[in-house]
């Protein structure tokens, strides 16, 4: 048996008036996901426990079978693993966003989805100007970067994700608590370095949002995972554009497969991800394919972009992998789901349960579900499940 887990990050949503009070999944054309739901078993999964923030880190750990109550230590350490940044026992890793500020507010949590090439120049400049014995900057992908603080600095600082406070006054949400003043001052110092940087002057000339500040959040120590093979007896691989998912894969002992042109946005290399997934399954039991674009569109509050992202995920990821599975000599089990909702109306993550469907190519089932969306799956036989149990269900199905 081969297994494919297909994640459309943030696909789930609330009913939208402009779509006739339908959700994005209800309004989008998604024949491949609908087929999986109609011929498999469906239900709702709780990916984020009530006591945890509704982040992609917590949600995707859960989906991969790692209970956050046991394994979660923060988002940034997972990203550090993907970036090849080793953490000492007293190192605290922080996500460092490049953001756009205007009139004392966070205008754009992604600095206009700045390119990785531009961002690397800015992060290298910040590291040159602001690094100390206890603070180092590391470039990542697009707006997503890393700060490593030594000597337990910032471990207890209270931080807010910037995508939760777009349009809000910065002063209300600066880091607070122990070491909060230090990191607030670091944010202010970054503005001096970035404001007149040639990269940003050019972006302004081109009508793009400048990356004129950093924002720190998501900190934590290096976690300790039990290997996926030891827990579930399967050899697997992770395919994603974002360091967070790659880091989870690394800590889980899964192979992380790089795909050229995978951007974490609408312009990602869908076909490259499919080719990589099919190739990975020739020598592995399981592949975990993650697409970030629906989440980014949700954060932007764009109905049009989210519809496109969901339809592209269905037609360019789910459909070809489903076709491959159904024509394979080996039986396949496919799990399709978002990790969490990123509703257009709130532009950030929520912890509402998400729809999922499981389909076995050698054992089609009728589950009284005809479409893949938040409402239809409520008629499924699976009911409401804890997401960290899904891998076990998948393997035993």
UniProtKB/Swiss-Prot annotation:
Keywords: Glycolysis, Isomerase
Protein name: 2,3-bisphosphoglycerate-independent phosphoglycerate mutase
Molecular function via GO: metal ion binding; phosphoglycerate mutase activity
Function of the protein: Catalyzes the interconversion of 2-phosphoglycerate and 3-phosphoglycerate.
Record keyword Isomerase present: yes
EC number: 5.4.2.12
Species classification: Archaea, Methanobacteriati, Methanobacteriota, Stenosarchaea group, Methanomicrobia
Broadest EC class assigned to this enzyme: isomerase
């Amino acid at each position: 048996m081969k297994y494919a887990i297909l994640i459309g990050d943030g696909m789930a949503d609330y009913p939208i008036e402009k779509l006739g009070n339908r959700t994005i999944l209800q309004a989008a054309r998604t024949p491949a996901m609908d087929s999986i739901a109609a011929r498999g078993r469906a239900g709702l999964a709780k990916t984020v426990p009530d006591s945890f923030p509704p982040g992609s880190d917590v949600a995707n750990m859960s989906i991969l079978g790692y209970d956050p109550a046991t394994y979660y230590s923060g988002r940034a350490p997972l990203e550090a693993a993907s970036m090849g940044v080793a953490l000492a026992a007293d190192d605290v890793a922080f996500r460092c966003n490049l953001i756009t500020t205007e009139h004392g507010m966070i205008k754009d949590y992604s600095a206009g989805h700045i390119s990785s090439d531009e961002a690397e120049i800015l992060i290298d400049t910040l590291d040159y100007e602001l690094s100390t014995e206890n603070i180092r900057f590391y470039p990542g992908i697009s707006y997503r970067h890393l700060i490593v603080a030594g000597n337990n600095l910032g471990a207890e600082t209270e931080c807010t994700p910037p995508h939760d406070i777009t349009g809000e006054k910065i002063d209300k949400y600066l880091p607070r608590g122990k070491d909060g003043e230090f990191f607030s001052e670091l944010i202010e110092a970054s503005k001096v370095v970035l404001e007149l940087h040639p990269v940003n002057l050019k972006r302004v000339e081109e009508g793009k949002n400048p990356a004129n500040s950093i924002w720190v959040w998501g900190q934590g120590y290096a976690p300790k995972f039990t290997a996926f093979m030891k827990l579930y007896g399967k050899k697997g691989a992770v395919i994603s554009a974002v360091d967070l998912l790659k880091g989870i894969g690394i800590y889980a002992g899964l192979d992380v497969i790089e795909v050229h042109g995978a951007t974490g946005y609408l312009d990602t290399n869908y076909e490259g991800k499919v080719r990589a997934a099919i190739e990975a399954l020739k020598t592995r039991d399981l592949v975990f394919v993650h697409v970030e674009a629906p989440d980014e569109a949700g954060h932007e509050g764009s109905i049009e972009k989210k519809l496109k992202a969901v339809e592209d995920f269905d037609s360019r990821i789910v459909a070809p992998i489903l076709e491959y599975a159904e024509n394979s000599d080996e039986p396949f089990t496919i799990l399709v789901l978002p990790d969490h909702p990123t509703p257009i109306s709130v532009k950030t993550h929520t912890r509402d349960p998400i729809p999922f469907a499981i389909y076995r190519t050698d054992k089609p089932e009728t589950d009284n579900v005809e479409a893949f969306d938040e409402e239809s799956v409520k008629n499924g036989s699976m009911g409401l499940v804890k997401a960290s149990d899904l891998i076990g269900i998948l393997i035993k199905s």
